[in-house]
C-alpha cells in the first residue's frame, strides 16, 4: 500500500513535466507540418504589414510599413517602400529602385521573409508550447510560443498559424531590449501564375542598375 502511495505521489510530481513535454512536441509538430505544407506550394503571393515597436519616453513608438512577397519554389522576392530583396535560389540581393543600385548580400534563411524560411529558422534551438487560439478576420489562429535556448537578444517569438489552411498568419519577435517586431499577413494567395523573370537579377528590369 505504501509502495502504491509512493508511486502515485511520484506520478503526480512527474505529471506537469510530462504535460510540458507533450505540449512541446505538439507545438513543434504543428510548425513542422506548416513548414512541410509550405514547401509543397508552387507559388505564393503575400501582402503584409511589418511593424517595429521600440520603447520611447515610457511608451512604445511604432513604425509600420507595407510590402509584398512573391515566392516561386526556392526563389523569393520581397518589395517594400525602401528596398527590395531578391533571392534566385543561389544568391541574394538588396535592390534600391530609387537609386538604381543592387547589392549582393548573404543568401540564407535569416535574410528572407518567406514563410518557409521563417519556420525553418526555428526547427531547433528553441522550446515550444501551444499558446492558445484566437478568432481573427474570420479565421481560427493557433499560436505557438517559442523561447530560445540561448540568446541574449531574443526573449520570445510568437507564431500564428491559420488552422484551416496551415499557412503562416503572423509572426512576432520580442527582444530583450524591449523592441517588438511583427509580420502580419494581409492577404495570402497560393499557386497563382507568376512571371519567372521577376526573380532574374539580370532581367531587363534592372538594366543600367549600378552593382555595388
Regions found by a protein language model. Give the residues of each.
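Bacterial N-terminal signal peptides that target proteins for export
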Residues: 1-10
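N-terminal leader/targeting segments and the immediate start of mature chains
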Residues: 13, 19-61, 70-75, 205-212
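A short, amphipathic edge element
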Residues: 28-30, 46, 119-130, 183
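A short, surface-exposed beta-strand/turn
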Residues: 65-66, 71-72, 86-88, 157-170
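An acidic-aromatic
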Residues: 66-113, 181
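Flexible, surface-exposed loop/linker segments and immediately adjacent secondary-structure boundaries
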Residues: 107-139
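Gly/Pro-enriched, hydrophobic low-complexity segments
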Residues: 131-133, 137-211
Amino acid at each position: 500500500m505504501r509502495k502504491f502511495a509512493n508511486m502515485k505521489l511520484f506520478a503526480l510530481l512527474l505529471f506537469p513535466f510530462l504535460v510540458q513535454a507533450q505540449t512541446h512536441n505538439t507545438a513543434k509538430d504543428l510548425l513542422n507540418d506548416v513548414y512541410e505544407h509550405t514547401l509543397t506550394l508552387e507559388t505564393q503571393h503575400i501582402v503584409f504589414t511589418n511593424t517595429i515597436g521600440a520603447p520611447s519616453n515610457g511608451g512604445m513608438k511604432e513604425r509600420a510599413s507595407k510590402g509584398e512577397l512573391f515566392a516561386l519554389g526556392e526563389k523569393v522576392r520581397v518589395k517594400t517602400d525602401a528596398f527590395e530583396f531578391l533571392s534566385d535560389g543561389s544568391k541574394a540581393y538588396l535592390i534600391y529602385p530609387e537609386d538604381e543600385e543592387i547589392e549582393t548580400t548573404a543568401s540564407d534563411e535569416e535574410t528572407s521573409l518567406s514563410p518557409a524560411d521563417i519556420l525553418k529558422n526555428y526547427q531547433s534551438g528553441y522550446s515550444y508550447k501551444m499558446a492558445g487560439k484566437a478568432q481573427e478576420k474570420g479565421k481560427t489562429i493557433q499560436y505557438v510560443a517559442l523561447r530560445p535556448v540561448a540568446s541574449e537578444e531574443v526573449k520570445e517569438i510568437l507564431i500564428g498559424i491559420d488552422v484551416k489552411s496551415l499557412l503562416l498568419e503572423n509572426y512576432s519577435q520580442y527582444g530583450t531590449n524591449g523592441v517588438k517586431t511583427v509580420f502580419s499577413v494581409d492577404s495570402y494567395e497560393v499557386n497563382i501564375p507568376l512571371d519567372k523573370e521577376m526573380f532574374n537579377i539580370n532581367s531587363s528590369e534592372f538594366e543600367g542598375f549600378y552593382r555595388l
